[in-house]
Design a protein with these regions (language model features):
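Bacterial N-terminal signal peptides
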Residues: 7-15
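Positively charged n-region of N-terminal signal peptides that target proteins for export
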Residues: 1-7
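Beta-propeller folds
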Residues: 13, 20-623, 629-635, 639-640, ...
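Serine-hydrolase catalytic core recognition
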Residues: 613-733
Length: 733
């Protein structure tokens, strides 16, 4: 009896141990581990959306409510956007990936493949509307109530569709009544296609009412005004080919340019009251498409062609280029567009066998022949900027061969731009390497006159937000410089006397880079420049002494400014600013706040984790989402306000990790043969026993110990060691 009891007990304990033993990561896990994609937070901070996507397989959309901590799940949902009024989520519903793969193997024709569907979720009621066969959609961020979606080519018989991703029938509304011609022949109805377009639908999100426009090729929307712009190939005499504006408030489709042609690069100004686009009205299919630039504003009956091949403004053998999208300044006072010289055309009278196919290379070329081939498409699309002053009806050539590139100032509102020219130094770049020197210019947008401010700058010049200064980091001088537009004086800002503003750990045979600029304060008064650890406040005129705002060097703590408002053009010196904090010695990180006028930053959250450097804040509240990670902690989405006291976990991307043997990482110190003290990382399997021997992998690659607290997701790779995979299998790294 005792023997039987002992035997049963041993069997039970063995079973328990076997059951409790964690699994090793296998190759299946390399392709099934989830990543978080396309995360966003609503303007009011009450909603967070994100997709979970494995290496291979279908994504899952998650919609989280901060009020009740509940999450809704939508299979195969991707690319979600939250409406500006926080009432709706609009997203794509993809077909099953396995289905698509199987059909590709069977070589099913593209038009028979399953298409994406559209999902519209009402956040208040949780009602979901699905619309099949949608290839794209646009949901405005700064105004609300409408969504536009572009349909796929309609199938003649929807009952024969290969896969219906929403299980909904789509009525065929494209058929028109057939009219008999005078000769008694039936006129075929126009069909949708790549050259004729498909349906564009404007949907009122609240009422569900829809306005359908047929045979649409492309569409866009205004940033702030409730308007959409589209071009259609037309249907008949009642709806002709051209460019149309849909006003959501009036629910009205207005023709702004009716003409047969080809239209590209439609754009609004910020308010939606002005429109520009490229128009090719030629019907002869010339080798060089004669595009013109069209313009329309509120109150105009029709758009007008500002510039085309007949305009005296253009130099001989130059044209309006359709390669670059025209753009308005923020205040709408300027319209920028590109012009280019006509390309060299091939002799079309030659037969194919008469065309000599040879590549000619010369040692005198400024650019290596292989690089010329690599850059060929880019050079074919190169444009030179022109500005049209909308109030003055005046064109000014800004860019040309001597100043081929420009940077706009003050969101395009400024009357000057910064010009670049690296052409004189292109050849020497072959042996000099990066950065390529360039000459810097200030270009007057009223006159087109160019003033050279500095030759052969080995670094990128940038205009300040209000276009009062130009700053650049000179690589040979390892210093920042500032140029005043008003005084026309150059000032060296950083001296590298007590603190280096170049990469202190640079160890390659080239010039060291800088640590970057955090930004500018209001009205371009100060520029904030980073060193290895700290943020410094500099007077761009050089009159005031620089001020160290963060004082992190003593403790080897690095502070970096976090830009929470993507549209903020300056840093408000009177408000507290969120900083990312990282300690180089311990590798701990976190967040802190800084008030520039009151002293040192205050750390409010810190730990042995890698906290995200770019948390995202809700537009209208102090709620934000961020991540933290370590070798054992996946970077799931976290949610909090600026106190960081009540942190909620939003996502749980890989709950299965608890079932697998993982491991841990720690810093490892040693002295090299030259007597230098070095820092590395040592990763050990879970339940590491120092008395046992383990197989070990050694990875020498640059400086990676700062990534001690980085999560290493199982994933396939060609030339890297997947840490979690090997450690799970008993290796040390």
């Amino acid at each position: 009896m005792n023997k039987l009891t002992i035997t049963l007990t041993l069997i039970f304990l063995t079973s328990v141990c076997t059951f409790a033993q964690k699994k090793q990561l296998g190759h299946d896990e390399l392709i099934s581990w989830n990543r978080i994609q396309n995360s966003q937070i609503s303007n009011d901070g009450n909603w967070v959306t994100y997709s979970l996507k494995p290496e291979k397989g279908d994504a899952v959309l998650k919609v989280w409510n901060s009020k009740n901590n509940q999450t809704q799940t939508f299979e195969r949902g991707e690319g979600a956007k939250i409406s500006g009024d926080n009432q709706f989520v609009v997203f794509k519903i993809k077909p099953h990936q396995d289905t698509v793969t199987a059909m590709k193997r069977r070589k099913v024709k593209k038009n028979k493949m399953p298409k994406d569907s559209l999902g519209i979720l009402n956040l208040a009621t949780s009602d979901l509307v699905k619309i099949e066969d949608v290839k794209s959609f646009k949901l405005p961020e700064k105004w609300s109530g409408w969504v536009a979606y572009h349909k796929e080519i309609e199938k003649p018989d929807t009952t024969k569709a290969a896969v219906d991703t929403t299980q909904m029938e789509s009525p065929d509304t494209t058929q028109t009544k057939k009219k008999k011609s005078k000769k008694g022949k039936k006129k075929r109805p126009k069909k949708e296609g790549k050259k004729t377009g498909t349906k564009l639908v404007f949907r009122d999100l609240v009422t569900g009412k829809e306005e359908v426009v047929e045979f649409v090729m492309a569409y866009t929307m205004a940033e702030e005004g409730p308007r959409f712009l589209l071009n259609s190939t037309g249907k008949d005499s009642t709806f002709e080919e051209g460019v149309y504006l849909f006003d959501c408030e009036k629910e009205e489709l207005k023709p702004i340019f009716v003409h047969k042609g080809e239209y590209k690069n439609m754009t609004f100004d910020k308010s939606g009251s002005q429109v520009a686009f490229h128009a090719n009205l030629d019907t002869l299919e010339m080798l060089i498409a004669p595009y013109g630039l069209a313009y329309w504003k509120d109150g105009d009956e029709t758009a007008t062609i500002l510039v085309d091949t007949t305009s005296q403004f253009l130099a001989e053998d130059w044209r309006v280029s359709e390669s670059g999208r025209p753009s308005f300044s923020e205040d709408g006072s300027k319209l920028y567009f590109g012009v280019a010289p006509n390309p060299i055309l091939q002799d079309t009278s030659l037969l194919e066998e008469e065309i000599v196919k040879v590549e000619v290379w010369s040692w005198t070329d400024d650019v290596l022949h292989t690089q010329q081939k690599n850059n060929l498409d880019q050079e074919k699309k190169r444009t030179y900027q022109v500005v049209w002053h909308t109030q003055e009806n005046r064109l000014v050539q800004v860019g040309n061969m001597s100043v081929p590139e420009i940077q706009k100032g003050d969101e395009g509102n400024s009357d000057i731009v910064l010009g670049y020219n690296e052409n004189p130094y292109i050849k020497s770049a072959t042996w000099r390497g990066f950065p390529n020197p360039r000459d810097l210019y200030i270009v007057d947008l009223k006159t087109g006159k160019k003033k050279e401010i500095k030759k052969a700058v080995e670094g990128s010049g940038r205009l300040s937000p209000k276009a009062k200064y130009v700053t650049w980091f000179s690589a040979p001088d390892t210093a920042y410089f500032s140029y005043s537009i008003e005084s026309e004086e150059i000032v060296q800002l950083t001296k590298n006397e007590n603190v280096a503003f170049f990469n202190e750990l640079h160890d390659s045979p080239s010039y060291p880079s800088s640590y970057g600029i955090s930004g500018w304060t209001e009205d371009d008064k100060y520029v904030l420049i980073n060193d290895r650890y700290d943020i410094w406040k500099f007077d761009p005129t050089g009159k005031e002494r620089p001020v160290n705002l963060t004082q992190g060097r003593e403790n080897q703590t690095r502070y970096r400014y976090i830009r929470l408002d993507p549209e903020a053009r300056n840093i408000n010196s009177n408000e507290r600013q969120l900083l990312h904090v990282f300690n180089e010695k311990t590798k701990a990180s976190g967040y802190g706040f800084l008030r520039m006028n009151t002293g040192k930053p205050v750390t409010i959250l810190s730990g042995d984790f890698n906290y995200s450097t770019r948390p995202r804040k809700a537009k209208d509240t102090d709620k934000l989402m961020f991540t933290k990670q370590s070798f054992t902690v996946f970077p799931d989405i976290l949610y909090s306000d600026f106190s960081f006291q009540n942190i909620k976990q939003v996502s749980e991307a890989n709950p299965q990790q608890k079932d697998y043997s993982w491991g841990s990482g720690e810093l490892y110190y040693w002295t090299d043969l030259n007597g230098n003290k070095l820092t590395g990382m040592l990763y050990k399997p879970e339940n590491f026993d120092p008395l046992k021997k383990y197989p070990m992998l050694v990875n020498f690659y640059e400086k990676s110990s700062d990534r001690l607290h980085s999560y290493r997701a199982p994933s396939p790779g060609r030339s890297t060691i997947n840490y979690s995979f090997y450690i799970s299998r008993g290796y040390m790294i």
